[in-house]
Amino acid sequence: LSDDARARIVRCREYLDRKMENPERPIYGITTGFGSLCDISVGSDELSRLQQNLVMSHACGTGERVPSEIVRLILLLKIQSLAYGHSGVQLATVERLVEFFNRGILPVVYQQGSLGASGDLAPLAHMSLPLLGLGEVEYKGEVRPSAEVLAELGLEPIRLQSKEGLALLNGTQFMSAYGVWSLIHARRLSEWADHIGALSLDAFDGRIEPFCDEVHLIRA
């Protein structure tokens, strides 16, 4: 993270903390429940637990595991999003995601089960579980409990602060990662297709006149 990104993250978190100093003004999903429970107040001693429960309750993915290269892209895109300083997360949470990315600690995410209402909720919940010492990660080619890997590396689980569960789960990093991956491969395939086509034309002793610029200018 750059110094500017760190400053933005800290500044946004401080702003949120100031807004929460007024208990008379409820803030959706922070001092209230979610969805139909939006009129239920949440006490200050339960704010962290609310966010942790949000992550755990949405970690309901099924199917095959998401490939490792896609998970790395998910982490990168989530880090980029949070680094803009608009999400209200604590700096430690973003730094831990950066550490996961740099050390190759890849959360186990599943391909099916996303709710999709506010983004890729289920996949991003699975991405977030290892921050709490929950779920599984792929580390050095092995799938292991995240708590075990964190302990091995001397890392303590993150204690989510108010709003952090929302910030981690809301977003489109899962589908965006697949989109980026597909675009990269499409560009490579496009280049290969040109080379393969040229070699095939040469192998069959084809004529190159149909490819001249002048021909296509006339046809246009």
What are these language model-derived features?
Residues 1-220:
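Conserved, well-structured ligand/cofactor-binding cores
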